[in-house]
From Swiss-Prot:
Function of the protein: Cell wall formation. Adds enolpyruvyl to UDP-N-acetylglucosamine.
Protein source organism: Protochlamydia amoebophila (strain UWE25)
Domain of life: Bacteria
Protein name, per record: UDP-N-acetylglucosamine 1-carboxyvinyltransferase
NCBIfam families assigned to the protein according to its UniProt record, in alphabetical order: murA, PRK09369.1
Catalytic activity from the UniProt record: phosphoenolpyruvate + UDP-N-acetyl-alpha-D-glucosamine = UDP-N-acetyl-3-O-(1-carboxyvinyl)-alpha-D-glucosamine + phosphate
Lineage start: Bacteria, Pseudomonadati, Chlamydiota, Chlamydiia, Parachlamydiales
Active-site residues from the entry: 119 (proton donor)
GO terms of biological process kind: cell division; cell wall organization; peptidoglycan biosynthetic process; regulation of cell shape; UDP-N-acetylgalactosamine biosynthetic process
Length: 465
């Protein structure tokens, strides 16, 4: 498998464009399965998770035309070929479980969905999904199969709207409940719902599709069921995770990068924390410029939370930033229980990070009585040294890229498909920003990145009709 070599110490400088949001586009594809109308998407990210989701949707009957260069995709699902999701998708991402909510109103057949996958960052149970769907009238059973297992679901008596209070504002459970509520009879009310920008994006798309749906400031979503749908054109919001990632990479490398498409509204909490450590940024009409504005100051307490709190996917690269900040900082992860495994590699590179099982620096969270390392103390600033790194998951992957960019000497990074799941053309963008990067193929030939690498492919082309 190919590996990436990065020689650190070069400030990133230039401009990149934030691609369409992974966590929006993948869910919009699933939502389009609710109807038999054509949906046209713009600003579609050319990333691995969209590839997998397209392949999954095609498996059950979606027709797809994807102009990757233009970022335009047309989809239509005139009829379902099957309601069985093959087990090869079980470890791909978290999308398969959302098929239950989307397909319950589209078929009378059993919907068979393999065990959920995604990044190995915690247990990420789907109990909240199942409980909410059952309240709407779905019958769901888990059965062991040859390799893993699958959920069997149906709504032979139809779905009926009701009041659902989620135990925790889970993004996935909120999405699944919304999708099922669209075709349920009557009104569905979801309390304690997630209100992430990607949830709002889903709601905007569904309203265009024909839904009558509202969202209130108290985390309440109301849906009037319908089966009357329309053709839709929709532009996907820029990815706030990618935008923040490039911003942190710019500042930690003592550089200056303008991120086209970065949206101020969806990054308020992140920008506040960035300013607290001394990171510079300039909000413009078409994006945000991030720049090194002098030595970074730690002494920060950071707690991840559901929106509008500090996003859990910003946590790993921000920890790398804190390793370059003077003083002692505390990070408390409250969304996923097992998201500090990546720090072992950072410590081997020279970082001073100590994970703890206790809730440090703030409120107690739902992991307080469990034996998970979900807090960390980071002491900086510490120099980092290059090493061989194996990427374990998507967001830790970018944290390792950041660490390699600021490390002394050269790092060799494997597991690149994890980053390709969520970052469009990240190697080309690194090269365009001046990073010293080279891709080493299996036969050990080295490909130096040309000056203008913005068109370099990330992965093998998926055949999409």
């Amino acid at each position: 498998m190919d590996v990436l070599k990065i020689t650190g110490g070069i400030p990133l400088k230039g401009q990149v464009k934030a691609a369409g949001a992974k966590n929006a586009m993948t869910k919009l594809l699933v939502a389009s399965l609710l109807s038999d109308k054509k949906c046209t998407f713009y600003n579609v990210p050319n990333i691995g998770d969209v590839e997998v989701t397209v392949s999954l949707c095609q498996e059950i009957g979606m027709e797809v035309r994807w102009d990757r260069a233009a970022g335009i995709m047309e989809v239509i699902t005139k009829e379902l070929k099957t309601s069985y999701i093959p087990q090869r998708f079980s470890g791909s991402n978290r999308i398969p479980i959302l098929m239950i909510g989307a397909l319950l109103g589209r078929t009378d057949q059993d919907i068979i969905v393999p065990t959920a996958g995604g990044c190995p960052i915690g247990q990420r149970p789907v109990d909240f999904h199942i409980q909410a769907l059952e309240q709407l009238g779905a019958v769901i059973e888990y059965r062991g199969m040859k390799r893993e297992g699958a959920y069997f679901a149906h709504a032979h008596n139809g779905l009926k709207g009701t009041l659902i209070t989620l135990p925790y504002p889970s993004v996935g459970a909120t999405e699944n409940t919304i999708l099922a509520g669209i075709t349920a009879r009557g009104v569905t009310v979801i309390k304690n719902a997630a209100i992430e920008p990607e949830i709002v994006e889903l709601i905007l798309f569904l309203q265009k599709l024909g839904a009558i749906i509202t969202i209130d400031v108290d985390r309440t979503i109301r849906i009037q069921g319908t089966r009357r749908f329309y053709e839709v054109e929709h532009t996907v919001i820029p990815d706030r995770i990618e935008a923040a990632s490039w911003g942190m990479a710019a500042i930690s490398s003592k550089g200056k990068v303008f991120v086209e498409g970065a949206q101020h509204l969806n990054m308020i909490t992140f920008l506040n924390k960035l300013r607290e450590v001394g990171g510079g940024f300039d909000v413009r009409s078409n994006g945000i410029e991030f720049f090194y504005d002098g030595p970074l100051q730690g002494g920060l307490h950071l707690e991840t939370d559901v929106h509008p709190g500090f996003m859990t996917d910003w946590q790993q690269p921000f920890v790398v930033l804190l390793t370059q900040s003077s003083g002692t900082s505390v990070v408390h992860e409250t969304v996923y229980e097992n998201r500090f495994g990546y720090t072992d590699t950072l410590k081997e590179m020279g970082a001073d990070i100590t994970p703890f099982r206790q809730c440090l620096g703030g409120k107690s969270c739902r992991f307080a009585s469990q034996s998970f390392s979900h807090s960390a103390i980071i002491k900086g600033a510490t120099p980092l040294v290059g090493k061989e790194i194996r990427i374990p998951d998507l967001r830790a992957g970018f944290a390792y890229i950041m660490a390699a960019l600021i490390a002394n000497d050269t790092s060799t990074i494997s597991g690149l498909p994890f980053i390709q799941r969520g970052y469009e053309n990240f190697i080309g963008k690194l090269a365009d920003l001046g990073a010293n990067v080279s891709l080493v193929e299996e036969e050990k030939n080295v490909k130096e990145m040309p000056e203008n690498s913005s068109k370099l492919p990330l992965f093998a082309e998926l055949q999409v009709n």
